[in-house]
Amino acid sequence: MKIAVYGKGGIGKSTTSCNISVALARRGQKVLQIGCDPKHDSTFTLTGFLIPTIIDTLQSKDYHYEDIWPEDVIHKGYGGVDCVEAGGPPAGAGCGGYVVGETVKLLKELNAFYEYDIILFDVLGDVVCGGFAAPLNYADYCVIITDNGFDALFAANRITASIREKARTHPLRLAGLVGNRTSRRDLINKYVEACPMPVIEVLPIIEDIRVSRVKGKTLFEMVGSEPSLNYVCNYYLGIADQILSQPEGIVPKEIPDRELFSLLSDLYLNPIGGGGQKKKIQENFLGFTRI
């Protein structure tokens, strides 16, 4: 099974992806996580350091695939999760989609691409071109990470459009949304009501998740010295269980941008509940309008 994880930049995709990968490994799966971001920090939480990228390795070998061994590009992370970083072209040049293609090509050359039960692609930020949507060409499912804010839901809606487009040519499905760092879910609920899709899980604001990223450790590793974090791990195990159930998934239909703006701004102007909720919604809205 191949899973592509998308979402707005800075939403916590990589931290979420790493914890999901470990959760899947805990369920007995052989897992490979592929970071698809020029920052090449997707797997930092699994390995504790920035591993060499596929592109760096190819360049050092003058693109002679026959001179590259699996151990040159596949690094062992926490919990037995194997890690690969695709890397990216130089800033302002090249195409991220080409890099993803080269990564998959090399893994196939090494007979590694089909050796895993789960391959998880952790993909950079918003989908702005076909190149960044390239991992969807290989995925069975897409998971979108969001929060309860305007920006993240607009990005989710754009990703939804990419899923629909890619699903025309192969059996790609949206498994659902994962809410991250979310104290409320009113905007999420409003969005999925208008654009029906599953909500796999909604994680509350948990400071230890942010701290885990800084430490370069997954929550599963941290729980060894902090047993009180077990409850956080259960969120990720629940997500893993839903993925392993091979959900039917959907081919979503995105909402036109202006309609989405109207939909979410209506909730801002006509909040349900007291002044505290209205203030929180206003903060989300103003954060969007400043962009």
Curated annotation (Swiss-Prot):
This enzyme's EC code(s): 1.3.7.7
GO cellular component assignments: chloroplast
Cofactor note: Binds 1 [4Fe-4S] cluster per dimer.
CDD domains: Bchl-like
Catalytic activity: chlorophyllide a + oxidized 2[4Fe-4S]-[ferredoxin] + 2 ADP + 2 phosphate = protochlorophyllide a + reduced 2[4Fe-4S]-[ferredoxin] + 2 ATP + 2 H2O
Group of enzyme by EC: oxidoreductase
Predominant cellular place of this UniProt entry's protein: plastid
Positions with a binding annotation for Mg(2+): 14
Keywords: 4Fe-4S, ATP-binding, Chlorophyll biosynthesis, Chloroplast, Iron, Iron-sulfur, Magnesium, Metal-binding, Nucleotide-binding, Oxidoreductase, Photosynthesis, Plastid
Protein name listed in UniProt: Light-independent protochlorophyllide reductase iron-sulfur ATP-binding protein
Organism: Pinus koraiensis
Gene: chlL
